[in-house]
Amino acid sequence: MSSQISRSVGRWEKGASNLQPDVEIVQRLLETAAHALQAPELDPKGVDGKIAQVSAKSNTVAAIEAFQSRSNISIDGLIEPDSQTWQALMQAAGGT
């Protein structure tokens, strides 16, 4: 699995690109972090490479926001390459 995203993932209304390969990477990392931290609220409920257009219905956006809250990061529902959220997620999932 690649350990980097090329564009932003998360809330469409925040301008996220949500490219399928990037979304899949984030979803897999969230799954891994949910298991490692024993935090089911971080589980995006599947890896399909998609973000619901209505963020309130997106399990992935909910998982991103739960991760940001747990990590004391500003909650915006967005993960950008090399952002604080990305770095924390990589660490939580055991990535580099």
Locate predicted features.
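Cell-envelope/ECM-targeting effectors and their regulatory/trafficking segments
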Residues: 1-96
